[in-house]
Amino acid sequence: MRQRDTILIVDDMEINRVILDGLFQEEYHLLEAENGEQALLLLRQYHENIAIMLLDVVMPVMDGYKVLQEMGANGLLDEVPVVVITADNSLEGELRAFDLGASDII
């Protein structure tokens, strides 16, 4: 079994990725994606190494909710916990993320 020492950061805003990189770069290997499609490609390739995914909701190409749907359909939520990072603090958004399999929401 491989060591899970990688964080996958998924956010279309570069500044958010830079901030998160700064928080975790000394302790973890980091992978970055700008949208959900890129995230799923990286996840399929490196899922055995990924300790956690930090996932934005609102992104172009494929949003975070669709990523959670795809992960659930492919059994990847059992392997990689997902923390949703979003400015949307609505109850509806939180419930949707949890219903789709998010481990937590920030």
Predicted feature locations:
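Non-catalytic signal-transmission and effector/linker regions of two-component phosphorelay proteins
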Residues: 1-8, 13, 44, 49
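Two-component/phosphorelay signaling modules centered on CheY-like receiver
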Residues: 2-5, 13-32
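Acidic, metal-coordinating helix/loop segments flanking the phosphotransfer/catalytic sites
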Residues: 32-52
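Receiver (REC) domain active-site loop signature in two-component systems and cognate sites
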Residues: 59
